[in-house]
């Protein structure tokens, strides 16, 4: 069996990715590593939550030792975890930095230590900035 490890797998994008890989790769076990905060819910995975092929780990990306431990022997690592909603970042700056910056560093360090060969990093539409009226003229 292949091991697919998805951070943020209970969030909106992450849960859709989890279901996609679950259905597409029947010979795999999916590990979802998610802090499960305001923007995530195990209910997003209710269609597959009873399967023995799905393991949900409620942990934070800032916990490097747990991340390294649980991601051992991973064949494909998908990093979809992030604090989202730009407005929240103004009031929760430290939380955003811990998750989005330190958390991503921890993901990359754990993948390096565990010799993960395939990594997919999901980002946000916010990296593109605003679209101006003349952008598509």
Regions found by a protein language model. Give the residues of each.
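N-terminal Rossmann-like NAD(P)+-binding domain of SDR-like oxidoreductases, especially those catalyzing
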Residues: 1-137
